[in-house]
């Protein structure tokens, strides 16, 4: 049985449309969580403008990065730290909530013996949040380390670990095991995994650029929530795509779990 991208896209889209209300609900809650955390830790408008003015003439070379950092005062370094903490923490917690609830929802719906309920889903997924926090932090760390060296290694890391969030919801699968199995599955299905991950990253980059401008210019929080929501909805579609591919791969080889 061959697995084509076209069939996967259609299958994922059908599931996505059928569950659109639940998807919007979880995506909205995740967006609100991310926005609240971002608001709590984000530097105020004056601090952001000060930082923006400092880097306005920065051309991006490594030497200039070192020079810029050395030129910063302790207060400006603290502002940069708060900005970084705000972005990373809001993304980490929001994604942990989103991934745990969406994958739990898919597991429940696929198991026709169980009835899906939003509030029961939140309760069931809450026990998975610590594992997702750890896994997402680890994936983000490895991906950013790869991108710090060169862009391609970071993308490769993300591609090969893309099944691990699905796998850790299975019984007796540790974070380490989920990573190992994810690499194995991805290696066997690289032609159907890589294109969708590349597309997802491109869309996320566009959203990131726009939302970063919103942060610098101090737009309303409701507008930022909207961009978080759009990002979450797109991410959910990718999760559904990857889950469907995982199921088909499991049927095809029947030896991943």
UniProtKB/Swiss-Prot annotation:
Listed InterPro entries: UPF0259
Major location category of this protein: membrane
Keywords of the record: Cell membrane, Membrane, Transmembrane, Transmembrane helix
Keyword Cell wall biogenesis/degradation applies: no
Domain of life: Bacteria
Bilayer disposition of the protein: Multi-pass membrane protein
Compartment(s) where it occurs, according to its Swiss-Prot or TrEMBL record: Cell membrane
Gene Ontology CC terms, in alphabetical order: plasma membrane
Cystine bridges: none
Membrane-traversing stretches: 23-43, 89-109, 122-142, 148-168, 190-210, 223-243
Family note: Belongs to the UPF0259 family.
UniProt-recorded name of the protein: UPF0259 membrane protein WIGBR3650
Organism classification: Bacteria, Pseudomonadati, Pseudomonadota, Gammaproteobacteria, Enterobacterales
């Amino acid at each position: 049985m061959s697995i084509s991208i076209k069939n996967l896209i259609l299958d994922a889209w059908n599931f996505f449309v059928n569950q659109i209300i639940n998807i919007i609900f979880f995506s909205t809650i995740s967006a609100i969580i991310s926005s609240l955390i971002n608001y709590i830790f984000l530097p105020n408008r004056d601090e952001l403008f000060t930082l923006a003015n400092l880097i306005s003439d920065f051309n991006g070379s490594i030497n200039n990065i070192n020079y810029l950092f050395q030129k910063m005062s302790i207060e400006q370094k603290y502002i940069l730290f708060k900005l970084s903490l705000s972005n990373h923490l809001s993304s980490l917690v929001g994604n942990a909530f989103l991934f745990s609830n969406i994958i739990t929802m898919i597991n429940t719906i696929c198991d026709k013996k169980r009835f899906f309920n939003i509030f029961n889903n939140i309760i069931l997924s809450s026990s998975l949040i610590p594992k997702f926090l750890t896994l997402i932090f680890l994936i983000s760390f490895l991906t950013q380390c790869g991108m710090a060296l060169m862009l391609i290694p970071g993308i490769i890391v993300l591609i090969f670990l893309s099944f691990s969030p699905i796998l850790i919801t299975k019984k007796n699968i540790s974070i380490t095991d989920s990573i190992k199995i994810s690499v194995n599955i991805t290696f066997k299905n690289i032609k159907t995994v890589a294109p969708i991950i590349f597309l997802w990253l491109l869309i996320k980059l566009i959203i990131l650029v726009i939302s970063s401008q919103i942060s610098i210019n101090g737009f309303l929080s409701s507008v930022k929530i909207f961009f978080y929501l759009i990002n979450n909805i797109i991410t959910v579609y990718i999760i559904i795509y990857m889950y469907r591919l995982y199921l088909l791969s499991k049927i095809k080889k029947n030896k991943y779990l």
